[in-house]
C-alpha cells in the first residue's frame, strides 16, 4: 500500500526588538546568564506586565507579509503550565484570537513549480527561560530568554513531502528576514521549528495519527527528520501496526528519530484571558503605517534582477536568498557596479571567503564601495583578475580603498610597452636554452616565455598587452 505524507509546521520566531515583550529588560542574545532579567522576568509578587508596542508592530508586519487577516481587537491569554524555566507557572500568549490568521505563502519547489501553502495562524507570546543540567548534578535556570518576544507561525497541513517542508521554511525565512522583524538565526535560537507528520492511504481524506518532531536545529535536519519519519511510519503501517501519537526528537548523529514521550491526549493548558493586560484595538491607520514600512520582498526583487539587470534566474535566486547579501548587491549596483560582475564576486570569492572564515558578510570589512572600486580597477587594467583575488582578501580583512591599497602595495599592472619590451628582451637573455629551442622550431617552445615573463614581472604584467608584445618580439627573434 502506498501512503500520502501530510506535514504541518510550527515555527517560533524571536522578534528583534530591543527589549522584551512585557518588561524593559534587554532582549539581546549572548549575554551572561540571568544578566537580562528584572522583577517582571522573575515574576515577583505584585509586578505587572507592560506590552511593548514594537512587538505589535512586528506582529502586524508579519501578518501583512504572510497575506493574513488581522484580528483588530487584541487581547492576550494565559497558558497555564509548570516548568522550572517558567517562574510564573503560566505563559502569556494568544489563544482564540491570534494577531493573524488565514494566510498563505507561495513556495518554489526543486522542479521549478510553485505551490501555495496555507498559514492557519500567527500569534504573539513570550518565550520561556532555559534549563541547563550541569555535570555537578545540579540543574540551572537562565532567564535571559524569559519574556523575549515570539511570534508562532502555524501552517496548515498542506505539505506533502519533506521537500515541500524545506521549501516552505526557506520561503518563510526570506519573508520574515526581509520584513525586518527577525534575524531568523537558527544557531542562536531565533527561529525554531517543530514538525507534525502523518501518513494516510492515497485517496483517504481523514488524516492519520500524527507524530510531533522536535530538536530540528537546521532546515537540513527538518528535511532529514521528516524523511526518516516517512520511512518509519510507512514500515509500521505496512506491517499492520498502528502509529501512536507521540513526540520524537531527531538524533543527528544516527539520523533517526527517538521517542521523547507518548501523548495520551491534548494538553489542558486551561487558557483564560490575561487579566493584567487590557484589551486594545489595532486601527486601520496603524495597519497602513506598518504596510508602508514593508520592503520589496524576495519574489519581486528576483523578478527585477532578471528583467532590469539581466541576471539569470539562478543568480537572482542566490542573491535574494539572504537579505544582507541582496542589500549589499543593491547598494553596489546603485554605486555604478556592473550587476553581473558584482553578482559573480558575491557568489564566488566572497562566498568562499565567508565559508572558510566562518563569518557573515556583516562581520568582514568588505563594503559595496570598495568592491565596486576593485571591479573598476580590474576593468581599467590597473590590476589583473589574479591580483584582484589578493586585493579582495586584504579588503575583506582590513577594509580601506582598493586603488589606494594596490598603489601602496606595488600591485599596479604593467601595461606600458616601454616598460614591458625591455623586460621581454631580458627574459630572452636570461633563457638562452629556451631561445635556442624556439629558433630550432621545437613544438610549444614559445609557451615557456609566457611563464618567464610573468615571473620576471611578479605577475604584474597585463596579460593581454604582455602576450601581444611577447608574440611581436618572438617574431622578430625568429627572423634574426
UniProtKB/Swiss-Prot annotation:
Highest taxon of source:
Bacteria
Keywords, in A-Z order: ATP-binding, Ligase, Nucleotide-binding, Protein biosynthesis
> Per UniProt, what is one Pfam family of this protein?
GatB_Yqey
Q: Which of the seven top EC classes does this enzyme belong to?
A: ligase
**Swiss-Prot/TrEMBL catalytic activity:** L-glutamyl-tRNA(Gln) + L-glutamine + ATP + H2O = L-glutaminyl-tRNA(Gln) + L-glutamate + ADP + phosphate + H(+); L-aspartyl-tRNA(Asn) + L-glutamine + ATP + H2O = L-asparaginyl-tRNA(Asn) + L-glutamate + ADP + phosphate + 2 H(+)
Enumerate the GO terms in the molecular function aspect. Answer: asparaginyl-tRNA synthase (glutamine-hydrolyzing) activity; ATP binding; glutaminyl-tRNA synthase (glutamine-hydrolyzing) activity
What's the Enzyme Commission number for this chain? 6.3.5.-
Can you list the disulfide-bonded cysteine pairs? none
Q: Which GO BP terms, alphabetically?
A: glutaminyl-tRNAGln biosynthesis via transamidation; translation
Ligase listed as a keyword: yes
Q: Cross-referenced SMART domains, in alphabetical order?
A: GatB_Yqey (SM00845)
> Among its keywords, does the record have Disulfide bond?
no
Instruction: Report the PANTHER family cross-referenced here.
Output: GLUTAMYL-TRNA GLN AMIDOTRANSFERASE SUBUNIT B MITOCHONDRIAL AND PROKARYOTIC PET112-RELATED (PTHR11659), GLUTAMYL-TRNA(GLN) AMIDOTRANSFERASE SUBUNIT B, MITOCHONDRIAL (PTHR11659:SF0)
Which NCBIfam families does UniProt cross-reference here?
gatB, PRK05477.1-1, PRK05477.1-2, PRK05477.1-4
- Function (record text): Allows the formation of correctly charged Asn-tRNA(Asn) or Gln-tRNA(Gln) through the transamidation of misacylated Asp-tRNA(Asn) or Glu-tRNA(Gln) in organisms which lack either or both of asparaginyl-tRNA or glutaminyl-tRNA synthetases. The reaction takes place in the presence of glutamine and ATP through an activated phospho-Asp-tRNA(Asn) or phospho-Glu-tRNA(Gln).
On subunit structure and binding partners, the annotation says: Heterotrimer of A, B and C subunits.
Question: What's this protein's family per the entry?
Answer: Belongs to the GatB/GatE family. GatB subfamily.
UniProt xrefs under HAMAP family = GatB
Q: What is this protein called?
A: Aspartyl/glutamyl-tRNA(Asn/Gln) amidotransferase subunit B
